Design a protein with these regions (language model features):
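A residue-level marker of the well-folded mature domains of exported/periplasmic proteins
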Residues: 1-276
Length: 276
């Protein structure tokens, strides 16, 4: 939308496309003269790559766990483990019980790496912190996520990692805290969401648009452009919790953030399934 507002592009968008319809929609966009097709191929890898092969003059930038594919298929992924680590530090400092509950959708690399980074950050602040981890095997089932979160609260968790919708609702209802993922929902949960790891796609999209415009688009892994040094991710401002998070924790988080940006500290990318 920002590129459109600047008068740089015209674009069309389709939302909630079923996996069975994905290839058809991609082909329609490719045949309509669009120069760049952007989307997610996580569950439709074979179909997406097949379309790209059939339209070699069209550029594709797709969310994928796989590698770039010649001559026109670039990939991106949610490498926002850095702000996830920082959010974990905040969580470790804010949990009074030392017990944190984590509710995820599926134990896939894109979810695992963020959970593992979050856990590592929490452990830096509180090495004795304990985690409860549940996967609900769904991308969108707020009631199920909420139920899982309630179970963790009943076992002593006073802070929840909200990888799925429904978790922050559970935290709000029980007067507990939550940490958000990918987007900032603090406006909806001002007394609940203490921190969030945000993902910004603008650096990746802007790069792809420039390369297409210059006729220089080639297969590339855009993963690094989701990292903090490229402004592809960040720890959300503490907002309503600015005066509630202890100053010592804020100082530690800011120091770690500076080290990450300076290349002095690297957050490990661990795609393995996290364990309690």
């Amino acid at each position: 939308k920002a590129a459109e507002a600047r008068g740089e592009i015209e674009y069309k968008a389709s939302e909630n496309v079923a996996n069975a319809d994905y290839e058809r929609v991609m082909r329609e966009y490719a045949t309509q003269g669009n120069q760049l097709i952007l989307g997610e191929a996580f569950a439709v890898e074979a179909a997406a790559r097949k379309v790209a092969k059939d339209f070699p003059k069209v550029s594709f930038l797709m969310g994928s766990s796989g590698k770039p594919q010649a001559p026109n298929f670039s990939v991106f992924d949610n490498f926002i483990q850095e702000p996830s680590y920082l959010a974990g530090m905040v969580a470790g400092g804010m949990s009074k019980s030392g017990k944190i509950g984590m509710v995820g959708g599926y134990p896939i690399p894109e979810v695992n790496r963020l959970m593992n980074a979050f856990m590592a950050g929490a452990k830096e602040v509180n090495p004795k912190v304990q985690f409860s981890i549940t996967f609900i095997n769904s991308w969108f089932d707020p009631p199920k996520a909420k139920e899982a979160a309630f179970a963790m609260i009943d076992k002593g968790a006073d802070l929840l990692y909200a990888e799925r919708f429904g978790v922050s609702d559970a935290a709000k209802e029980r007067g507990k805290l939550a940490v958000g993922n990918v987007i900032n929902t603090q406006d909806k949960y001002p007394d609940t969401v203490v921190a969030s790891a945000l993902w910004h796609m603008e650096p990746s999209i802007d790069r792809a648009l420039k390369l297409v415009k210059d006729g220089k688009f080639t297969p590339e892994d855009y993963g690094p452009y989701s990292m903090m040094k490229h402004k592809g991710s960040e720890l959300a401002p503490l907002g309503t919790f600015e005066k509630k998070v202890p100053a010592a924790i804020v100082a530690k988080v800011k120091a770690k953030e500076a080290d990450i940006l300076a290349g002095k500290f690297t957050v490990k990318v661990d795609d393995g399934q996290p364990k309690s």
